[in-house]
């Protein structure tokens, strides 16, 4: 039988992992991924008649994208063209997916499959600044909870909500691949890393002022270097021919 200490530890771990499982569900729900949410339901803001068309500039970009693939394989361009639609519109209504299918001459279902699989495609409107807080294990161990709590208090919204002025949307996401710089958040295309609650408040203040905060670590270190500085690769690499026998 488990000792009382082991039982308590197991209970604590179960609660912790249960919370993060719920967070994953929240992320999936917000992005329109998972389970029954693969089924589209028309709403006043998201239906086949929702106005959407690419700009002339983006039609030219699509032509350039399609040329990267062999003739007859334009379906390979679904991901980048969906991304282009989202960058133009801010999110992907079903009408945008239909337009992508029309432009690439593929069945609409092929586009729906992609748009519902990747959570990076936003199937509901988001704010001008889409704040994605990583709460996976490495960030959690580096106190990402305090970052999330600070954002909720600062913005006056909960996870999955958008501020009334449509400026900020806040969601939780799974690993963003910057574990060595935990805790971190992604805001639109930029990573902000090595965060403290004070850092994230300053970032929000800059965004509210119309500025673009400098992305990357806030701790002063370069990229993902060790906090104490480099311990290897401390000098420029040797030139061509280094270590090669003179007769070769």
Curated annotation (Swiss-Prot):
- Modified positions (N6-acetyllysine) in chain numbering: 60
Task: Please give, as recorded in its UniProt entry, the membrane topology of this protein.
Answer: Peripheral membrane protein
A GO CC term attached to the entry: mitochondrial inner membrane
SUPFAM superfamilies documented for this protein: Thioredoxin-like (SSF52833)
What keywords are assigned to this protein? 2Fe-2S, Acetylation, Electron transport, Iron, Iron-sulfur, Membrane, Metal-binding, Mitochondrion, Mitochondrion inner membrane, NAD, Oxidoreductase, Phosphoprotein, Respiratory chain, Transit peptide, Translocase, Transport, Ubiquinone
A biological-process GO annotation? cardiac muscle tissue development
Q: CDD domains annotated for this entry?
A: TRX_Fd_NuoE
* Subunit: Core subunit of respiratory chain NADH dehydrogenase (Complex I) which is composed of 45 different subunits. This is a component of the flavoprotein-sulfur (FP) fragment of the enzyme.
* NCBIfam families, A to Z: nuoE_fam, PRK07539.1-2, PRK07539.1-5
**Which protein is depicted?**
NADH dehydrogenase [ubiquinone] flavoprotein 2, mitochondrial
Name the source organism.
Mus musculus
């Amino acid at each position: 039988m488990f000792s009382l200490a082991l039982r308590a530890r197991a209970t604590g771990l179960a609660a912790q992992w249960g919370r993060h499982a719920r967070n994953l569900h929240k992320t999936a729900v917000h992005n329109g991924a998972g389970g029954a949410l693969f089924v589209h339901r028309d709403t006043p803001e998201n239906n086949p008649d929702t106005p959407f068309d690419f700009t002339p500039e983006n039609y030219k970009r699509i032509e350039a994208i399609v040329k990267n693939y062999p003739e007859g394989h334009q379906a390979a361009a679904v991901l980048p063209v969906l991304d282009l639609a989202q960058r133009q519109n801010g999110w992907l209504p079903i009408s945008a997916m239909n337009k992508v299918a029309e432009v690439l001459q593929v069945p609409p279902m092929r586009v729906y499959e992609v748009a519902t699989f990747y959570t990076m495609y936003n199937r509901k409107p988001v704010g001008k600044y889409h704040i994605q807080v990583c709460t996976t294990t490495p960030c959690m161990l580096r106190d990402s909870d305090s970052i999330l709590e600070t954002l909720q208090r600062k913005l006056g919204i909960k996870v999955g909500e958008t501020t009334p002025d449509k400026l900020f949307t806040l969601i939780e996401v799974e690993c963003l691949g910057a574990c060595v710089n935990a805790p971190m958040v992604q805001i639109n295309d930029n990573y902000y890393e090595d965060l403290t609650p004070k850092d994230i408040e300053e970032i929000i203040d800059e965004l509210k002022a119309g500025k673009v905060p400098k992305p990357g670590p806030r701790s002063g270190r370069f990229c993902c270097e060790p906090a104490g500085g480099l311990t290897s690769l401390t000098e420029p690499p040797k030139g061509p021919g280094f270590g090669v026998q003179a007769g070769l």
